[in-house]
């Protein structure tokens, strides 16, 4: 008997139940008589929100000084898994220095709508990118002996009524869009805990959803860790235990502990189920205790430099007519309070108390830049007086270049509520338009956690998207504006022209009881590219101060089967005069003719550093899963036999290379034949196709010999026949004979 099982055997029922809930907001319970310690967990994901006095889970009370790293909206835009892992390592070391056993992150909910108030804490609209980046973060943190808690499992894609709303989603969209990031992280990086979400999923709370917490998470994905509730997400504690929820957070006053004891005593809860939950909780507790390393020292000054370096890799250059990088000899005007007081993080449970913050104005002053400053609009609201506008215009007119620092005030986007529009504050849009009348050289720097409408984008000289870049955002901004660093971030989400273009527009945020995911699998670029909806900036977009050329695409084979791994290689070259990094992106397109698939899906990416004139070969691998969609009839991933296209590019709307492969699968879709089964379904199945081909042979021969019939008309006729069900044979042959045919076909399928 191992240590934990032996401890459980010595526990009273009440002690077992007690371990299934927290001691307070941040600690697990201890049992002194058995030498079971308490361990601490704190909010992340982009820093430590450790509270030592009054505690809460919403970021209301003060926390210890820590380093605030860029939020996920920024780090995902780096497209750099190594950078994400290094950030995780640094966060893990900071946790060790503060005696914290678990960091509550990463957050991998898909950015379904740009209005979600918590989008700044999430990684991407694309599950592949989110999964890769989350896995790297988890590896980094846990390499330091600190646990993680990937969240919020699952479909917590809005803040409106997040604690009671039911996310109504198809099985296919669940599997293709909303679960893969969790699946990737669980299988590849084994987070110590998984945090279930507040909301319902198709009518059942996530904290009580056995299909989600046990059937998928544990049985399908093989997860061995602990499932913890979001703070206050438990509704029926006994049902939650039975579903697979191990640890309730925070402390519920002992009420739910007593419910567990009562359920066991009354025979409504098998004590073995409770024992399993206790074992998983103790695995977390003892891992935290045994892997605590007080020798690890975290230096905040060093970590601040890392935060600034990371943000430098994350910022996205959206527009540039050549004005950037700025010449240090030019007189530059900084306009907008964000230049002095940047918005560097979001509101809510992830809110960090930074030990320092460097603004762009600070950084310019430290380097002796020729910069004047006009505050003129507040970062806290949507207000600007005529006097403030006049001063801003004078300042802009007197400069060679005006840099306007715009973005969303914290009150516009935060945990707990959603935005109501994609617009910037009206005063900011007006200021930009007015400055353009007196100053042709206008650069806009954005601080926001989610896409915004940019009606003036075609008029300004450059736009630099900093997102919420952490406490070193000003240093990173200065480096990028003046060319000390080359922008290399790429958008991890699409910027539509307007909110109404977003695929979730008709359904977000629901009717108060439920929110229908009516766009199904067509989220983000999957919708825009397939529907051919013009967008302001595409997924993967981002400019550089240099240029890159692609060539020599090579596939390891022109054919592929279920078990094969295809190697895709190509060359990328820096054809400019500036050192830079290109984010190469690999997409897959299904050319088999299945209508309900996106025109392309991201299945690979890499960030490649290149000196001027340097060329490198990039290689990526593709498996059958990468070609597949989730087939509900099969209950599994399925790629039909046929042609697939490998696309290599700079963004989802900027494909540079492509090549086709032929894929052959041994999988067959399940089929049960009856009078409503179509000829097309039977012709597409290898076991029934010979019988139906023979049956339809006379009809095919007659059509082939018909005089005056064009090939196009013949194809239309073939399609009509394919769509006919077997019941149309009635009248052509006796009904009993049709029944006999159906029986014959089902026998063939059963073989």
Model regions and ranges:
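Glycoside hydrolase catalytic-domain context in secreted enzymes
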Residues: 1-628, 643-648, 652
């Amino acid at each position: 008997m191992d240590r934990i099982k032996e401890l459980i055997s010595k526990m009273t029922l009440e002690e077992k139940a007690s371990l299934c809930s927290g001691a307070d907001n941040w600690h697990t319970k201890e049992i002194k008589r058995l030498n079971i310690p308490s361990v601490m967990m704190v909010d992340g994901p982009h820093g430590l929100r450790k509270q030592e006095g009054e505690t809460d889970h919403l970021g209301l009370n003060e926390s210890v000084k820590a380093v605030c790293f860029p939020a996920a909206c920024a780090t995902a835009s780096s497209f750099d898994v190594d950078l994400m892992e290094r950030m995780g390592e640094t966060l893990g070391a900071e946790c060790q220095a503060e005696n914290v056993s678990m960091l509550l992150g990463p957050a991998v909910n898909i950015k379904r709508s740009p209005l979600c108030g918590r989008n700044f804490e999430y990684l991407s609209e694309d599950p592949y990118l989110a999964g890769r980046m989350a896995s790297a973060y988890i590896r980094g943190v846990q390499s330091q002996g600190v646990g993680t808690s990937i969240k919020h499992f699952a479909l917590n894609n809005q803040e409106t009524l997040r604690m009671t709303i039911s996310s109504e989603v198809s099985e296919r969209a669940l599997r293709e869009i909303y679960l893969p990031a969790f699946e990737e992280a669980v299988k590849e990086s084994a987070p110590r805990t998984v945090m279930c979400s507040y909301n319902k999923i198709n009518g059942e709370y996530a904290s009580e959803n056995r299909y989600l917490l046990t059937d998928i998470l544990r049985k399908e994905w093989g997860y061995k860790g602990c499932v913890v509730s979001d703070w206050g997400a438990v509704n029926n504690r006994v049902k939650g235990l039975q579903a697979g929820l191990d640890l309730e957070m925070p402390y519920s006053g002992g009420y739910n502990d007593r419910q567990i004891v009562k359920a066991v005593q009354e025979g409504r809860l098998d004590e073995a189920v409770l024992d399993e939950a206790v074992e998983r909780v103790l695995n977390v507790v003892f891992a935290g205790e045994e892997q605590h390393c007080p020798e690890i020292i975290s230096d905040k000054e060093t970590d601040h430099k890392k935060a600034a370096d990371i943000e430098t890799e994350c910022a996205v250059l959206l527009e540039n007519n050549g004005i950037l990088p700025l010449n240090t000899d030019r007189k530059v005007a900084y306009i907008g309070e964000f230049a002095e007081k940047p918005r560097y993080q979001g509101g809510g449970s992830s809110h960090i108390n930074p030990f320092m913050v460097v603004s762009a104005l600070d950084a310019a002053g430290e380097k002796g830049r020729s910069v004047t400053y006009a505050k003129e609009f507040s970062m806290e609201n949507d207000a600007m007086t005529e006097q403030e506008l006049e001063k801003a215009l004078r300042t802009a007119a007197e400069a060679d270049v005006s840099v306007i620092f715009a973005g969303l005030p914290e009150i516009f986007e935060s945990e707990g509520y959603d935005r109501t529009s994609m617009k910037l504050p009206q005063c900011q849009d007006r200021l930009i338009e007015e400055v353009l009348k007196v100053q042709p050289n206008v650069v806009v720097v954005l601080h926001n956690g989610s896409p915004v409408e940019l009606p003036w984008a075609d008029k300004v000289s450059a736009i630099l998207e900093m997102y919420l870049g952490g406490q070193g955002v000003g240093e990173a901004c200065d480096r990028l504006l003046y060319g000390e660093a080359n922008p290399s971030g790429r958008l991890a989400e699409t910027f539509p022209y307007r909110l109404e273009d977003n695929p979730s527009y008709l359904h977000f945020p629901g009717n108060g009881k439920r929110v229908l995911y009516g766009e199904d699998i067509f989220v983000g670029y999957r919708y825009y590219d397939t529907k051919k909806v013009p967008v302001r900036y595409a997924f993967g977009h981002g400019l550089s101060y240099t240029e890159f050329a692609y060539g020599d695409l090579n596939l390891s084979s022109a054919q592929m089967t279920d078990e094969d791994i295809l190697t895709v290689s190509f060359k990328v070259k820096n054809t400019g005069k500036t050192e830079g990094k290109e984010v190469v992106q690999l997409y897959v397109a299904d050319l088999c003719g299945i209508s309900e698939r996106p025109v392309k899906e991201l299945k690979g990416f890499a960030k490649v550093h290149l000196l001027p004139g340097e060329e490198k070969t990039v290689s990526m691998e593709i498996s059958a899963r990468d070609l597949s969609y989730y087939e509900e009839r099969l209950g599994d991933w399925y790629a039909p036999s046929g042609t697939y296209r490998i696309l290599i590019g700079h963004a989802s709307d900027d494909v540079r290379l492509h090549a086709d492969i032929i894929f052959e699968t041994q999988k067959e879709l399940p089929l049960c034949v009856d009078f409503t089964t179509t000829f097309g379904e039977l012709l597409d199945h290898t076991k029934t196709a010979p019988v139906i081909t023979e049956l339809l042979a006379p009809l095919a021969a007659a059509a082939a010999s018909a005089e005056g019939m064009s090939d196009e008309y013949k194809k239309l006729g073939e399609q009509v026949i394919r769509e006919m069900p077997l019941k149309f044979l009635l009248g052509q042959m006796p009904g009993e004979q049709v029944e006999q045919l159906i029986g014959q076909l089902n026998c063939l399928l059963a073989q």
